[in-house]
Amino acid sequence: EVLLEGPSGVLFKDGQKKYLPPGVKIVLLTESGAVLSNGDNVQF
């Protein structure tokens, strides 16, 4: 779950931080992870 999303990154509820390149956004968010618009995956 996303706790905070800003123009330069995302803070997930579990404390993970993911810095995002300009223009990259979350395109899919599930209970176990997220897929970013640049194809990267974040597991939590």
UniProtKB/Swiss-Prot annotation:
Transmembrane domains' residue ranges: none
Coiled coil: none
Keyword line: Cuticle, Repeat
Entry-linked InterPro entries: Cuticle_1
Domain of life: Eukaryota
Tissue specificity statement from the Swiss-Prot or TrEMBL entry: Calcified shell.
One GO MF term: structural constituent of cuticle
Keyword match Aminoacyl-tRNA synthetase: no
Start and stop residues of the Sequence repeats: 3-20, 27-44
Name by which UniProt lists this protein: Cuticle protein CP466
